[in-house]
């Protein structure tokens, strides 16, 4: 029987497993440091079986919080579902401590039902479904105060016990940074024997350097985890005044913005989305604005075209 991991365990999938100072004194150190002795997490097989009919999984990541990653996830989902009506899309909200997709997709107050084949995700549109821990809380104001192992268990349940059915694309809305949730989902979904495009990532940022600093870390995280990066989306790139029509940079790109960073890190820039108050109001109300003609939807069209062409 394996002992519980130490507090600062790097994780069995890490290249540093069994080799860092936190591993000293752990009864499992010899197992973790020897690749021939590592035990496969039984959850991986359960996840693989449950996700066999999900063609593509797309992680929506951000280095910094507050850059609009969840909003971008919602906009991408809405636009893809509208422009590809014959395809099926799912959204998995794995921001365990801050689930926002139920509100953004207009599903607050919905309930998750259990069936013989597992949890049934909540239907948003004819070709969109959603699963979030927000559906399992008694109140939207409930705080989730969990350590890593419990988050890991919840993510494994979402991946292995939800009846996703046949999906062309599952978008996973993640928390900011590179934390337990990211390590868990990469461990369960990464399959080096699967087609390269079965799991990939998009990183969301804003133009200012304080956000780009953490995007560089996120890019390196993906590379270490062997997750292909489809590209970067620069959110809130500019603001056009509704009265005078002039455009302003709310977050000045002093170091060249996402374009310069993408060139430096050798990743594609998928496009830029403006700061649009109508998007904010629609997301708060859980409404779909992707049918409306605007700078935002024009930019979304170009971004979504690049996403779909990569699969």
From Swiss-Prot:
It comes from the Eukaryota. CDD domains: Mrp_NBP35 (cd02037). Its cofactor is [4Fe-4S] cluster. It holds the Pfam family ParA. Keywords: 4Fe-4S, ATP-binding, Cytoplasm, Iron, Iron-sulfur, Metal-binding, Nucleotide-binding. It is found in: Cytoplasm. One of its GO terms (cellular component) is cytosol. [4Fe-4S] cluster 1 binds at residues 9, 23, 26, 32. SUPFAM superfamilies: P-loop containing nucleoside triphosphate hydrolases. Heterotetramer of 2 Nubp1 and 2 Nubp2 chains. Component of the cytosolic iron-sulfur (Fe/S) protein assembly (CIA) machinery. Required for maturation of extramitochondrial Fe-S proteins. The Nubp1-Nubp2 heterotetramer forms a Fe-S scaffold complex, mediating the de novo assembly of an Fe-S cluster and its transfer to target apoproteins. This is Cytosolic Fe-S cluster assembly factor Nubp1 homolog. It comes from Drosophila grimshawi. The lineage of its organism: Eukaryota, Metazoa, Ecdysozoa, Arthropoda, Hexapoda.
